[in-house]
Curated annotation (Swiss-Prot):
Protein name: Protein translocase subunit SecA
Organism for this UniProt entry: Francisella tularensis subsp. tularensis (strain SCHU S4 / Schu 4)
Comp. bias (Basic and acidic residues): 852-888
Annotated stretches, region: Disordered: 852-906
Cysteine disulfide partners in this protein: none
EC numbers for this chain: 7.4.2.8
Entry keyword annotation includes DNA-binding: no
Sorted UniProt keywords: ATP-binding, Cell inner membrane, Cell membrane, Cytoplasm, Membrane, Metal-binding, Nucleotide-binding, Protein transport, Translocase, Translocation, Transport, Zinc
Purpose of the protein: Part of the Sec protein translocase complex. Interacts with the SecYEG preprotein conducting channel. Has a central role in coupling the hydrolysis of ATP to the transfer of proteins into and across the cell membrane, serving both as a receptor for the preprotein-SecB complex and as an ATP-driven molecular motor driving the stepwise translocation of polypeptide chains across the membrane.
Cellular compartments annotated: Cell inner membrane; Cytoplasm
Sites where the protein binds ATP: 86, 104-108, 511
Oligomeric and partner information: Monomer and homodimer. Part of the essential Sec protein translocation apparatus which comprises SecA, SecYEG and auxiliary proteins SecDF-YajC and YidC.
């Protein structure tokens, strides 16, 4: 019934395309009129549109004219005319949806339409790409169009200094990577002066390869961190011991003879010790003198040893060189499992990166303490409007809609797609599969057909390369090790009988043109004459026709990826813009996807039925593969959804802290803010010793006096005052405490330089808030890692997490207020000698903070070494008395730690 209705009225997607086609007709009707405009008249349109917006007109009304303007500018500056389907794509993006456009349909050009329209508001447009190369390339390619129309274009890449970043963000349209935009947001919320912040408002963002960024990278939060204590000796110790542990094939074994020391869960990438393994590692640690004879690993004080052990166990059993990471310049570089790209600067958390460094014998860098973090899911939700482009979003439409509220619209191709997709061939072993791939390649290049082979890992690409070399078949390899040659290798991939082996092609961003890339060939000529160019074109046309006759580009997949979307991205490299093309996947029952997620019984039956070199290639196996991929996609979706649910708790807190911090940063004078905080602190302190509504017998006035003296340098004899006038009630005493704190502060600052005091107050607020937020993030991490254990007590871990995270947050805010008022209460007029010493201490403290920020920026390759900041000239202030640390005995004499007594204001 549903299919019948769809045949009559069309699918939702078809109805949408039909609806926006009317807008396209309107844009097309304007084309003759805009063609008659002079360059100056066309350029003046930008000013006209901005005036109309200022007078109350909305962007939707301007769309047909604005798009017609961009199309005409494209024709005049780039000799590129936007197709009708590209106009549809632009409308979809403007409406805050995801446009699924096939490879070769010109997504880069499409983005110019909504980018120009939305930049007319003056609030800026961000265009996100997956790497620096594409950000620079796309900005350079399209800058002629934007600049012709009076729009400024900026690019954010890794090696820019803060001033260059600020200028790029101030442009009408800014290109850059998701990482750069995210890290700049975090760094802006760590700045100590408004001028240090580089970003402005987050208005409208267009995300290229939106599925890769919002889905594949959603599980990896952006983290800015500083180094903690060095524990390299512990990693080296466990790295030496772990290889002695034997792997058990599965979690449950039938008899003791099969039991080994540990087993792995490849789905979750975790490794677990068995009881036998615990006993074995305990004995080894006792021999090493790390554990006492009567000690055991289960003891609470050995939890850190378990941390090192688990990290090293995972490093040895689950993470492989040239598959999950490579070693480059004596550093571990992670490989993106979705794109096959190296990701320098990224590090695994939970000690895993250090464990892999120990395993590979490179320098072990200290574990980091989180200073600021955010997931891409929550970062992009900060924008007023999100839009995205990709070649393969339809399979992830549900997730994009449920998490981001993004609707996926499939854009028709400009020309019919005529790619031939062959059935998968499945072999019994990996070796048989690779042999079959080599034979297929040999046959195809004999007729002049170019071949692109997609592999899931560097290791697979190198194995295949070795086999091709033995057969003397010329080929190029593109993986994380050869990323510098990427553009030139892809430019050659469409040549007749050319063979290219590449790890996952997602995000490569360069079209493979049949016969080779003509523009690249012409660009390589030095001072070419018209005759030279004509000859190159003639040769290219011959090659182009020859490749088409041979069947176009053939895509060979060496295995299925966990996600159908990644397979579709690989397939999508063939048959662009109506060209012919083919695709075929080769699998073996030993491939990770089938080995981990397909049923074991089915795998055994297939292997048993296949003789050496034989393969299966028919319908039911496609269903098996599709079912296995569906399991993986569902599993990963649940992980991402779970991550978001937990991160939303921290995200709410992050918004509160960052908004509060920004108000501190922007305020010229924070004295009113501090006055309000002093009132809160006085009330909190008072009720710590005088419970609200309690009888006099429960009052601890002596303890309150001690706290006032030790934390606020205030001598106030409350007991004497009460004895002299027993009519004093709770409210009267509270008022006395509040007034004493206020008067003491006014008295101590009235003779100080007001500018220096204001500066010191602002810095104290920012530094104290940062310190407490950082400690809070660490506490939240510990809570998150242990909260699932609540399930054993029949409690919902998520609800428990929300409740305890809120309690931690409330306590953190109280502690922040208390500490900042306490520190400001300990300033006094200093002697000249003390002034010089105070200035030196101040500069050292500022240096520590800057070094902390520098270490973070260095970790992410974003530091401008030439930039030097002048230390604030605060000469008249210094702390009186030593600072009480959180774990020191509380000065009030209670016998408790400070953090459990006066640091904690309920």
């Amino acid at each position: 019934m549903l299919s019948l209705v769809q045949k009559i009225i069309g699918s939702r997607n078809e109805r949408f395309i039909k609806k926006v086609s009317r807008i396209v007709q309107k844009i097309n009707s304007l084309e003759p009129e805009f063609e008659k405009l002079s360059d100056e008249q066309l350029k003046a349109k930008t000013f006209e549109y901005r005036e109309r917006l200022a007078n109350g007109e909305i962007l939707d009304n301007l769309l047909p004219e604005a798009f017609a303007t961009v199309r005409e500018a494209g024709k005049r500056t780039k000799n590129m005319r936007h197709y009708d389907v590209q106009l549809i794509g632009g409308i979809v993006l403007h409406q805050g949806k995801v446009a699924e456009m096939r490879t070769g349909e010109g997504k880069t050009l499409v983005a110019t339409l909504p980018a120009y329209l939305n930049a007319l508001t003056g609030d800026g447009v961000h265009v996100i790409t997956v790497n620096d190369y594409l950000a620079k390339r796309d900005a350079e390619l399209m800058s002629d169009i934007y600049e012709f129309l009076g729009m400024s274009v900026g690019v954010i890449v890794a090696d820019l200094n803060p001033q260059q970043r600020k200028e790029a963000y101030a442009c009408d349209i800014t290109y850059g990577t998701n990482n750069e935009f995210g890290f700049d947001y975090l760094r802006d919320n760590m700045a100590y002066e408004k001028e240090q912040q580089v970003q402005r408002s987050r208005n409208y963002v267009i995300i290229d390869e939106v599925d890769s960024i919002l889905i594949d990278e959603a599980r990896t939060p952006l983290i800015i961190s500083g180094a903690s204590d060095d524990r390299s000796e512990m990693y080296n110790l466990f790295n030496r011991l772990v290889p002695y542990l034997e792997k058990q094939e599965k979690e449950e074994v039938e008899n003791e003879q099969e039991q080994r020391d540990f087993y792995v869960d490849e789905k979750s990438k975790n490794a677990y010790l068995t009881e036998k393994g615990y006993a074995k590692i305990e004995n080894m640690l006792k021999k090493e003198g790390i554990l006492e004879e009567d000690d055991n690993l289960y003891s609470p004080h050995n939890i850190t040893k378990m941390h090192y052990l688990n990290a090293c166990l995972r490093a040895h059993s689950l993470y492989q060189l040239n598959i999950d990471y490579i070693v480059r310049d004596q550093e571990i570089v992670i490989i993106d499992e979705s794109t096959g790209r190296a990701m320098p600067g990224r590090r695994w958390s939970d000690g895993l990166h250090q464990a892999i460094e120990a395993k590979e014998g490179v320098k072990i860098n200290a574990e980091n303490q989180t200073m600021a973090s955010i997931t891409f899911q929550n970062f992009f939700k900060l924008y007023n409007k999100i839009a995205g482009m990709t070649g393969t979003a339809d399979t992830e439409a549900f997730e994009l809609h449920s998490i981001y509220g993004l609707e996926v619209i499939i854009i028709p191709t400009n020309k019919p797609m005529i790619r031939k997709d062959h059935h998968d061939e499945i072999y019994g072993s990996v070796r048989e599969k690779f042999d079959a791939i080599v034979e297929d390649i040999k046959e195809r290049i004999s007729k002049g057909q170019p071949v692109l082979v997609g592999t899931a890992s560097i290791e697979a690409s190198e194995v295949l390369s070795t086999l091709l070399k033995k057969k003397k078949i010329r080929h190029n390899v593109l993986n994380a090790k050869q990323h510098e040659k990427e553009a030139s290798i892809i430019a050659m991939a469409g040549y007749p009988d050319n063979v290219t082996i590449a790890t996952n092609m997602a995000g490569r961003g360069t079209d493979i043109i049949l016969g080779g890339n003509l523009e690249v060939e012409i660009a390589q000529l030095e001072d070419p004459t018209p005759e030279d160019i004509a000859q190159i074109k003639a040769e290219w046309l011959k090659r182009n026709e020859a490749v088409k006759k041979a069947g176009g580009l053939c895509i060979i997949g060496s295995e299925r990826h966990d996600s159908r979307r990644i397979d579709n991205q690989l397939r999508g490299r063939a048959a662009r813009q109506g060209d012919p093309g083919e695709s075929k996947f080769y699998l073996s029952m030993d491939d990770n996807l089938l080995r981990i997620f397909a049923s074991q019984r089915m795998a055994e039956r297939v292997k048993k039925g296949l003789k050496g070199g034989e393969s299966l290639a028919f319908g039911f196996m496609s269903k098996v593969i599709s079912k296995a991929q569906g399991k993986v996609e569902s599993y990963h979706f649940d992980i991402r959804k779970n991550l978001l649910e937990y991160d939303n708790v921290v995200n709410t807190q992050r918004k509160v802290i960052y908004e509060q911090r920004q108000s501190f940063l922007e305020a010229e004078d924070v004295s009113d803010i501090l006055a309000d905080i002093r009132i809160d602190v006085a009330e909190q302190l008072f009720h710590d010793y005088v419970p609200a509504g309690s009888m006099h017998e429960l009052w601890d006035l002596e303890g309150l006096e001690k706290a006032l003296k030790s934390d606020f340098m205030i001598e106030l004899d409350l007991q004497k005052l009460y004895e002299e006038d027993d009519s004093l009630g709770e409210e009267d005493l509270k008022r006395l405490v509040r007034e004493a704190i206020e008067i003491e502060f006014v008295e101590k600052t009235k003779n100080l330089d007001s500018g220096a005091v204001r500066q010191f107050e602002k810095f104290s607020l920012l530094q104290s808030l940062d310190t407490h937020w950082r400690e809070h993030l660490s506490s939240i991490d510990h809570l998150r890692n242990s909260i699932n254990l609540r399930g054993y007590a029949q409690k919902d871990p998520k609800n428990e997490y929300k409740k305890e995270a809120f309690e931690l947050f409330s306590t953190m805010l109280d502690n922040f207020k208390y500490e900042v008022i306490s520190s400001l209460a300990k300033i006094r007029i200093a002697t000249e000698e003390e002034t010089q010493r105070a200035q030196q201490e101040w500069q050292e403290s500022m240096s520590d903070i800057k070094a902390e920020h520098e270490s973070v920026i260095d970790n992410n390759q974003r530091h401008d070494e030439d930039e030097q900041e002048e230390a604030p000239k605060v000469k008249q202030v210094r702390r009186e008395g030593p600072k009480v640390k959180r774990n020191d005995p509380c000065p009030c004499g209670s016998g408790k730690k400070y953090k459990q007594c006066h640091s904690k204001v309920e």
